[in-house]
Amino acid sequence: LSAAVDDSVRLWDLRTPAAQGNMRIQGHPIVAYDPSGLVFGIALNERSSILLYDIRKFDQNPFITITIDDTAALSQIMMPPRIPVLTHLSFSNTGQYILAGTSGDVHYIADTYTGKVVYRLTGHIGLERADGASVGLVPKAGISGQEMCWTPDGRMVIAGSAAGQVHVWALPEHPPATLPATLHSTTTLQGQEGTPSVVAFNPRCAHMCTAGAQVAFWLPDLP
């Protein structure tokens, strides 16, 4: 599954050279598969929304549309409120949650079953303010896009910050009563030289990698 600068989303079979499906959808799409391979998501900046599709019905309408409306919280910071540029999309290990990362100072987690945004992740500094040339379709996104990921168990989100730290958010065991709930980073890791613009977690081992000007490997502190 791929998204292109011409606002197209294509479905590929690696055994053939031609795309098996081609969808035209305006809004600088960002795409991601869920772990089952049966559902995919498309994040659209121009609509501030995430569309969920059944892969078996590629050419039909999405079965869920998740709208990211953070006006109430963002209006306390700026007027008029502006949703940061969406730069990242990834599903949790169970497929229940989807992480919508932005270039700004907030990321979002939505429930794919209910279509509601359940968490706002704050405490970091967005990479739209980091040094470096833009790597995305929208220049004001800066170098944002790959600086966040889930842990393999789907219980934590890890993301880089323009200040050089790596932030960790732990998701509560039970969903909040009031949506969306704001989660501040529970842990901040130091040691990465420069801005960590890429963050990845080993799917099998307790081993994390971050990269920017240099590549850093992280292991847990064992008792």
Provide a role label for each language-model segment.
Residues 1-223:
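WD40-repeat beta-propeller superdomains and closely related acidic/aromatic-rich repeat-like regions
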